């Protein structure tokens, strides 16, 4: 089956290439950014993902920046003409001109799977999700979540870490974050249900963002099927929640599902069950994927840098010693975790979970003297500025002190985006990470089983072997 699919794809590529050679594109007088498109349709997508799987995605950018002596270059990626922006100035232009010069973009087949309705634009979809997430993460709600997060972290460590000599970190970080988000966002307390949903989400995230060809038997096809099952599970939850509302049994706090049931479409009408289910899927995957990756990466760095671990432990012990034996963390406690957050920030600089997102030019735009035609796609590359010595001196050195002052070049540190459209879940993610590491470092020390294990992107960031570690309880 795979051979037949591959043969058909190669035949299509050959015919397209012949067409491309015979009917050459008309030359343009525009001063486009330097670069090449690579193979027709595929472009340089395969090379990008090959470097990702080797754990050196930044080479894709650095090689081209060096070759063209430019921090902006064009290529063809995910089937589209695309410009990579690799500078703080490029980031600033992109983040400061949403709706004016740029709009969100995803490959069509992925966009159609992401949008809750064919009649809604991607921009409207994002705006709707930002409203819901903004309500869910308003300051009073965040204060309420801290104790719940702390109780979840303690329960997770007792169940999956205590009594084990060796654990596989990445599996457990995914399990913890997904269960936590499921409970806070959708009032899911059943472990089995959360685990089943997490398996579906993992399939979607690991197999969706590849060459988007929806053919049975391919990885993308499996991701589409997982998405359909995910969708149906959420529709069942919506029916159950509506029944709870009728019977006045709904949760006390407004979770994501409650907020989505109040959301209206652009015509002022209630959202359909299918629209709500797709929004539920998008919010949950967004809240789960990057924080779970971040936990794995932070644990990796703390294993490699024992002196950093000791300082994190010292700060967390000071906070723990100021509280009663069974007293849960408060929002004010998290404000005191300044060094721990600096460490997490430096991990997110060196290994950002998200490699960047995409925009489309709404009009012709000039950047660094180059013309970006209307309709061209743009990619802001997180790794490019995070590893730029002009933005971060000695960029390969792990240095949490970078974040003690206000010396960071604006728009260079972008693991959550920047500007008016910074990730609305940033503070929610910060709380999850701080609460988890407050509990973890006080219970355990650890060492890597595979000393030279790399972080790779396949397509998302992950430890190549799942990051097995040996645990040493702190007595």
Curated annotation (Swiss-Prot):
Annotated GO CC locations: membrane
- Primary localization: membrane
Pfam assignment, any one: p450
Q: Which enzyme type, at the first EC level?
A: oxidoreductase
Q: In which pathway does it act?
A: Secondary metabolite biosynthesis; terpenoid biosynthesis
EC number(s) from the headed UniProt entry: 1.14.14.-
Q: How does it sit in the membrane?
A: Single-pass membrane protein
Tissue specificity, in the record's words, reads:
Expressed in flowers, maturing fruits and in juice vesicles.
PROSITE patterns documented for this protein: CYTOCHROME_P450 (PS00086)
Where heme binds, per the record, is at 423
Where does the record say this protein resides?
Membrane
Q: Which GO terms describe its biological process?
A: saponin biosynthetic process
Q: What is this protein called?
A: Luvungin A synthase CYP716AC1
Native organism is Citrus sinensis (Sweet orange)
């Amino acid at each position: 089956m795979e051979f037949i699919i591959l043969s058909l794809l190669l035949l299509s590529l050959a015919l397209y290439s012949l067409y491309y050679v015979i009917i050459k594109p008309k030359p343009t007088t525009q001063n486009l950014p330097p670069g090449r498109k690579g193979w027709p349709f595929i472009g340089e997508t395969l090379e990008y993902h090959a470097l990702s799987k080797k754990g050196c995605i930044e080479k894709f950018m650095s090689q081209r920046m060096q070759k063209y002596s430019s921090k902006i270059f064009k290529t063809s990626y995910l089937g589209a003409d695309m410009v990579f922006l690799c500078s703080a100035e490029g980031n600033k232009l992109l983040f400061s001109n949403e709706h004016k010069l740029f709009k969100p973009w995803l490959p069509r087949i992925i966009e159609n799977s992401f949008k809750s309705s064919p009649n809604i634009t991607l921009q409207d979809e994002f705006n709707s999700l930002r409203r819901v997430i903004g309500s869910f993460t308003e300051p009073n709600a965040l204060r309420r979540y801290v104790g719940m997060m702390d109780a979840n972290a303690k329960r997770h460590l007792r169940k999956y870490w205590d009594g084990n000599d060796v654990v596989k970190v990445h599996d457990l970080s995914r399990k913890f974050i997904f269960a936590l988000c499921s409970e806070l966002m959708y009032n899911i307390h059943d472990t089995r249900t959360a685990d089943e949903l997490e398996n579906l989400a993992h399939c979607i995230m690991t197999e969706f963002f590849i060459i988007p060809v929806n053919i049975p038997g391919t990885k993308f096809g499996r991701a589409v099927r997982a998405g359909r099952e995910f969708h149906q599970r959420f529709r069942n939850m919506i029916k159950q929640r509506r029944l709870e509302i009728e019977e006045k049994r709904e949760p006390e706090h407004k979770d994501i599902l409650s907020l989505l049931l109040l959301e209206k479409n652009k015509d002022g009408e209630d959202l359909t069950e299918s629209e709500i289910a797709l929004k539920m899927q998008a919010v949950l995957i967004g809240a789960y994927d990057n924080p779970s990756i971040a936990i794995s990466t932070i644990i990796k760095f703390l294993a490699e840098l024992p002196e950093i671990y000791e300082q994190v432990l010292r700060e967390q012990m000071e906070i723990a010693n100021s509280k009663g034996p069974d007293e849960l963390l408060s929002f004010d406690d998290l404000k005191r975790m300044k060094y721990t957050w600096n460490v997490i920030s430096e991990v997110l600089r060196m290994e950002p979970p998200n490699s960047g997102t995409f925009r489309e030019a709404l009009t012709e735009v000039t950047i660094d003297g180059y013309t970006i035609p209307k309709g061209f796609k743009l990619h802001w590359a997180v790794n490019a500025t995070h590893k730029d010595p002009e933005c971060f001196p000695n960029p390969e050195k792990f240095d949490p002190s970078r974040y003690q002052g206000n010396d960071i070049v604006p728009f260079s540190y972008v693991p959550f985006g920047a500007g008016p459209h910074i990730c609305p879940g940033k503070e929610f993610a910060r709380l999850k990470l701080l609460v988890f590491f407050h509990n973890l470092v006080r219970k355990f020390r650890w060492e890597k089983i595979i000393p030279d294990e790399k972080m790779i992107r396949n397509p998302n960031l992950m430890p190549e072997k799942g990051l097995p570690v040996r645990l040493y309880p702190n007595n």
